């Protein structure tokens, strides 16, 4: 099944779906290997992995380059956290074209102004685009996509900027009417009060996605009862990776040794495995000339060895079934 079709199925199936954050090829592959059915390509996590702020400091082309590695490394759908679409409707059209070329299944666009500010940063200006302008972005995205299953998700930031339920519902309804395949209702409260109120009042057939980063203590069963479509675990891969790296770095710095830490970290062999080293070894056997040719003789000479198995002493190499 196409990745776009997989994502659309996740959004519209009656069971609660989950998307897990990833920010590069390695984390995306780990997400799939763990068993998740879809990936959230987080703007915060990608920015953090590049060492920049989540304020559109990473260009959209840099994000797309990372997405290409993520897509190549996985077979499950990726939903991009596309911020505001990186500009106006025309930037959105260009973005959709490039995402489809890289087999990205969908994009989530928020109704704030470019350049955006992360929704959880306190004290910074959080300005919303007009509903009409944002509806134009949604229509432009839907008109641009070639694959009918490519998903455009409209992220509603009304609660984030301090507006009430009526404003959130009005915006979400307008975005659904403009053609959004789903709406994402966002909240920075520590409880799910706003989300519960929204879901109880939502009467559209368009599925609703949530991001419980702040109201993480809410039991998942509550989301099922509310008929939420999809839950996004939005930044927990990058945050756990940061904690693990900081712990390892601190230990090595303090002890000036890797003896204590080595048993606690992933072995190099596991790194090779997730990179697909075994597949490359098999491919070398199929495609490299002379890979499986038996050695019939050895000429000892000065200079670098041309023998592939360089780690084996020449006296131990098999010639005609016997070592020298």
What are these regions (language model features)?
Residues 14-16, 292-295:
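A short, charged/proline- and glycine-enriched loop
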Residues 293-324:
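N-terminal glycine-rich phosphate-binding loop and ensuing alpha1 helix
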Residues 232:
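Active-site loops and adjacent core secondary-structure elements that bind or stabilize anionic groups
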Residues 2-229, 240-243, 247-250, 287:
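Alpha/beta enzyme core
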Residues 7, 236-292:
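Extended, intrinsically disordered, low-complexity segments
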Residues 212, 253-256, 301, 320:
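Residues at the C-termini of beta-strands that transition into short coil/loop
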Residues 24-25, 235, 322:
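Alpha-helix N-cap/helix-start capping motif
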């Amino acid at each position: 099944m196409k990745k776009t079709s997989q994502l659309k199925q996740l959004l519209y199936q009656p069971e609660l779906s989950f998307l897990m954050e990833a920010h590069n090829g390695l984390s995306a592959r780990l997400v799939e290997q763990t068993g998740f059915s879809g990936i959230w390509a987080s703007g915060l996590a990608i920015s953090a992995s590049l060492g920049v702020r989540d304020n559109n400091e990473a260009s959209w082309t840099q994000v797309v380059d990372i997405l290409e590695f993520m897509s190549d490394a996985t077979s499950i759908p990726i939903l991009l956290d596309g911020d505001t679409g990186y500009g106006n409707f025309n930037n959105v059209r260009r973005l959709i074209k490039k995402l489809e070329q890289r087999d990205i299944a969908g994009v989530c666009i928020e109704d704030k102004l470019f350049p955006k500010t992360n929704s959880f940063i306190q004290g910074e200006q959080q300005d919303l685009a007009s509903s009409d302008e944002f509806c134009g972005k949604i229509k432009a995205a839907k008109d641009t996509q070639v694959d009918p299953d490519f998903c455009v998700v409209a992220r509603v930031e009304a609660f984030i900027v301090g507006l009430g339920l009526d404003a959130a519902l009005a915006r979400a309804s307008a975005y659904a009417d403009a053609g959004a395949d789903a709406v994402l209702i966002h909240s920075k409260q520590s409880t799910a009060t706003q989300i519960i109120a929204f879901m109880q009042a939502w009467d559209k057939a368009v599925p609703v996605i949530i991001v419980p980063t702040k109201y993480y203590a809410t039991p998942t069963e509550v989301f099922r009862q509310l008929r939420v479509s999809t839950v996004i675990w939005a930044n927990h891969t990058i945050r756990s990776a940061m904690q693990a790296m900081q712990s390892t770095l601190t230990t090595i710095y303090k002890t000036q040794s890797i003896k204590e830490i080595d048993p606690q970290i992933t072995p190099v062999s596991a790194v090779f495995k997730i990179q697909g080293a075994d597949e490359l070894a098999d491919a070398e056997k199929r495609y490299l000339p002379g890979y499986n040719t038996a050695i019939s003789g050895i000429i000892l000479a000065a200079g670098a060895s041309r023998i592939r198995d360089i780690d084996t002493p020449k006296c131990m190499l098999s010639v005609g079934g016997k070592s020298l």
